[in-house]
Structures are given as structure tokens and as C-alpha cells.
């Protein structure tokens, strides 16, 4: 992994008053395969508004979220959350995902064990608390065009291993 190298954009937030003016980092890869190479395989898309701005910058009406989502969906073979994961709060929007692409995307049981995701009441309690105390919206699916809030994040970790997007595409050639 390239977390602590110049292969990481390492974006930093402005100081956050609610956490004592600390800043937080967002890892993003400068590699073929992008962030799947350095961030543990988190599978997130930008907000719809960010994609729609491309339409204005390029003067191309097809460079908006609605049109680009078709191509983003082609990259993934989404695996919906299991019954256990749904009970713990994981959810998704069917139209926000593809189901026949080269990348296995879902709520991996391996990541669940390593990161203790979906393994107790803590996850749901956290989301409920930040919504109640801070007004942070709970998101059904962070890849549906609105990622302003908090929710469970799918990963590019399949049943047995983490796979960077570059590897999946290069294996097909």
C-alpha cells in the first residue's frame, strides 16, 4: 500500500471545531486504480453536484451524474448486503450499482472481521447519535449521488481478498 508515500493525495479537511479544531485526512490514490490501491478498498463516489459541474466545465451535456453513472455502474458487480448486514443497518439503492462488471463490490465479510463492521450495536448507535446530536443524515447508499451524511461504505474486497480496480481491469486484457 502507498498510504504514507507521495502516491497519496492525502487531502486534509479544514479544522473541525466540533473535535477541538483537529483536521482529518482523506486518502486518495495517484495510482492506476486510484484510491482502491491505498485506502482499504472503500468504494465511494463523489456527490452528484460534483459530477454535474463537469458538464459546465466541458460544455458537454453527457458529462453529468446521470450519464456518467451508467459507466460507473459498468465497473462493478455489486453484491447486496447479507441478511445479517441489513439487520445491522447496511443498505443500498439498487439503481446506484452495476451487477455485471469486473469489480466485486459489497459489504465484505473479511472487512467485517478485520474492522469489526456490522458486528454489534455500536455501528447503528453511532449513526443514530450523530444524527440526533449533530444532525448528520443517515445515508441509505453513499454511491447514489448524495454522500452528504454517514452510512456504511461498500468495498472492493471480495469474499477472499482486496482487489484494486487496476488489477481487475488489467487481468482482463
Summary of predicted features, one role per range:
Residues 1-173:
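N-terminal redox-cofactor-binding region of secreted/periplasmic oxidoreductases
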Amino acid at each position: 500500500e502507498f498510504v504514507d508515500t507521495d502516491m497519496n493525495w492525502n487531502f486534509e479537511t479544514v479544522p473541525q471545531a466540533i473535535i477541538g479544531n483537529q483536521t482529518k485526512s482523506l486518502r486518495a490514490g495517484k495510482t492506476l486504480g486510484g484510491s482502491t490501491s491505498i485506502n482499504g478498498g472503500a468504494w465511494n463516489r463523489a456527490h452528484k453536484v460534483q459530477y454535474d459541474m463537469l458538464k459546465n466545465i466541458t460544455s458537454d451535456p453527457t458529462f453529468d451524474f446521470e450519464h456518467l453513472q451508467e459507466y460507473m455502474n459498468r465497473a462493478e458487480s455489486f453484491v447486496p448486503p447479507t441478511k445479517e448486514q441489513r439487520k445491522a443497518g447496511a443498505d443500498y439503492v439498487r439503481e446506484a450499482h452495476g451487477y455485471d462488471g469486473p469489480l466485486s463490490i459489497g459489504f465484505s465479510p473479511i472487512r467485517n472481521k478485520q474492522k469489526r463492521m456490522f458486528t454489534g450495536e455500536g455501528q447503528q448507535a453511532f449513526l443514530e447519535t450523530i444524527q440526533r446530536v449533530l444532525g448528520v443524515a443517515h445515508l441509505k447508499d453513499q454511491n447514489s449521488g448524495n454522500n452528504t451524511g454517514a452510512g456504511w461504505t461498500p468495498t472492493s474486497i471480495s469474499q477472499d481478498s482486496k482487489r484494486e480496480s487496476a488489477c481487475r481491469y488489467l487481468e482482463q486484457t
